[in-house]
């Protein structure tokens, strides 16, 4: 049985639960219980505060954890990064009052900066030879300049709307963060086998993200040109149709290039284009 530590609420919690659900790992979250066992996979989920997850994994309380990179780097716990998960993306940035002219990092020399991430901020300032007064607070960091508690803030930024609503502007991006799957360095071989099965499922789900399964009818005489346009996984599937001179072509397209490629296919005579979502993809 593997124990995985997960944030107990918030965006990271929601996206983690969605990932486990897509991997067909059933976890009941209907009751506010700290430890919940999956009904169909040898895993149990321990719900914790995000800043407690790195320590719980490093100390062996949990075998795995899904945590924001920002918290993992800040805590400096001795755990292994197993996989970058690509969701709950944000950045840690320095922000100052919007009406202040910003000449560069030298502006922060001797200034008071409010933050919940003093370790990351100090490392950044030390690398750049800046001496600032780091003021540690938890929660509502963005109000600090407005109540004269600090000259600037160092905090998580997602959309930037919180900064705008507090009359602040982002001036330096210090690090970019996303969800990480971290693991204890001393897992047993039995637990590693379960981890490998978990990773197999996660990778199948992640591989299918932003991908579409596309079927189309294509004139056989243009097949070579059509296949050259398609950036399929290996080679598209081509099957002759009952109507002479036509073939059915099946492939997988990246959603980011979908409309660009579909336009080229139509110009080459493709018809009856059917687009389907992909839940999982085994590579």
From Swiss-Prot:
Subcellular localization(s) per the UniProt record: Cytoplasm
Gene Ontology CC entries for this record: cytoplasm
Main subcellular location: cytoplasm
Superkingdom to which the source organism belongs: Bacteria
Regulation of protein activity: Feedback inhibited by histidine.
Function: Catalyzes the condensation of ATP and 5-phosphoribose 1-diphosphate to form N'-(5'-phosphoribosyl)-ATP (PR-ATP). Has a crucial role in the pathway because the rate of histidine biosynthesis seems to be controlled primarily by regulation of HisG enzymatic activity.
Co-factor requirement: Mg(2+)
Family, as annotated: Belongs to the ATP phosphoribosyltransferase family. Long subfamily.
Organism: Phocaeicola vulgatus (strain ATCC 8482 / DSM 1447 / JCM 5826 / CCUG 4940 / NBRC 14291 / NCTC 11154)
Single annotated GO MF: ATP phosphoribosyltransferase activity
Catalytic activity: 1-(5-phospho-beta-D-ribosyl)-ATP + diphosphate = 5-phospho-alpha-D-ribose 1-diphosphate + ATP
Enzyme Commission code: 2.4.2.17
InterPro entries listed in its UniProt record: ATP-PRT_HisG_long (IPR020621), ATP_PRibTrfase_cat (IPR013820), ATP_PRibTrfase_HisG (IPR001348), HisG_C (IPR013115), N-reg_PII-like_a/b (IPR011322), N-reg_PII/ATP_PRibTrfase_C (IPR015867)
Record bears the keyword Glycosyltransferase: yes
Principal EC category: transferase
Alphabetic keyword roster: Amino-acid biosynthesis, ATP-binding, Cytoplasm, Glycosyltransferase, Histidine biosynthesis, Magnesium, Metal-binding, Nucleotide-binding, Transferase
Protein name: ATP phosphoribosyltransferase
Top-level taxonomy: Bacteria, Pseudomonadati, Bacteroidota, Bacteroidia, Bacteroidales
Involved pathway(s): Amino-acid biosynthesis; L-histidine biosynthesis; L-histidine from 5-phospho-alpha-D-ribose 1-diphosphate: step 1/9
Any one of the GO BP annotations: L-histidine biosynthetic process
């Amino acid at each position: 049985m593997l124990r995985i530590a997960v944030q107990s609420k918030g965006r990271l919690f929601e996206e983690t639960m969605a990932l486990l659900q897509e991997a067909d790992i059933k976890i009941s979250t209907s009751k506010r219980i700290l430890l919940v066992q999956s009904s169909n996979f040898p895993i149990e989920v321990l719900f914790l505060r995000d800043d407690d997850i790195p320590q719980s994994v490093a100390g062996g309380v949990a075998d795995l954890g899904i945590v924001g990179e920002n918290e993992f780097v800040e805590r400096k716990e001795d755990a292994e990064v197993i996989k970058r998960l690509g969701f709950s993306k944000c950045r840690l940035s320095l922000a100052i009052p919007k009406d202040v002219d910003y000449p560069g990092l030298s502006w922060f020399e001797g200034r008071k900066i409010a933050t919940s991430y003093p370790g990351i901020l100090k490392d950044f300032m030390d690398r750049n030879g800046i001496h600032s007064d780091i003021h540690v607070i938890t929660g509502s960091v963005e109000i600090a300049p407005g109540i004269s508690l600090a000259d600037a803030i160092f905090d998580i930024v997602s959309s930037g709307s919180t900064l705008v609503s507090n009359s602040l502007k982002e001036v330096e991006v210090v690090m970019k963060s996303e969800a990480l799957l971290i693991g204890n360095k001393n897992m047993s071989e039995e637990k590693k086998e379960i981890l490998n099965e978990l990773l197999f499922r996660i990778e199948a789900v992640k591989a299918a993200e932003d991908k579409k399964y596309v079927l189309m009818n294509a004139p056989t005489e243009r097949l070579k040109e059509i296949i050259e346009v398609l950036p399929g996984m290996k080679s598209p599937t081509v099957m002759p149709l009952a109507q002479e001179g036509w073939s059915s072509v099946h492939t997988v397209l990246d959603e980011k290039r979908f409309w660009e490629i579909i336009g080229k296919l139509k110009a080459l005579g493709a018809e009856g284009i059917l687009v389907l979502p992909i839940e999982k993809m085994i590579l």
